[in-house]
Curated annotation (Swiss-Prot):
Pfam families membership: Asp_decarbox
Name of the gene encoding the protein in the UniProt record: panD
Protein name (record): Aspartate 1-decarboxylase
Organism: Flavobacterium psychrophilum (strain ATCC 49511 / DSM 21280 / CIP 103535 / JIP02/86)
Cofactor note: Binds 1 pyruvoyl group covalently per subunit.
SUPFAM superfamilies per UniProt: ADC-like (SSF50692)
Record-linked InterPro entries: Asp_de-COase-like_dom_sf (IPR009010), Asp_decarbox (IPR003190)
Gene Ontology MF: a single term: aspartate 1-decarboxylase activity
Biological function: Catalyzes the pyruvoyl-dependent decarboxylation of aspartate to produce beta-alanine.
Amino acid sequence: MQIEVVKSKIHRVTVTGADLNYIGSITIDEVLLEASNIIEGEKVNIVNINNGERFETYAIKGAKNSGEITLNGPAARKVHKGDIIIIMSYARMDFEKAKTFKPWLVFPNEKDNSLK
């Protein structure tokens, strides 16, 4: 049996921008992508701590060490600059493997989205 489990989580990161006119996605600082094992184009779920919105989009790479977290396209309507969000991705795996699987968990500094 296959089940879906949390693979990666960037917990409580601050939105730095919202670009309604971009074609879609979420731009994430490359350092955060690498630390969380999320790849460009991967589907991610977003939970907005400030307003309770939950939605999905896909990740694109932002500049390294920029702290950028920008929601693009229609998703830009779901956030405001300064909102705190959680970014999660999931993976399917065998039920037995899932019992011991450990997700990548990242806890950035909410002030500048750094890992310091």
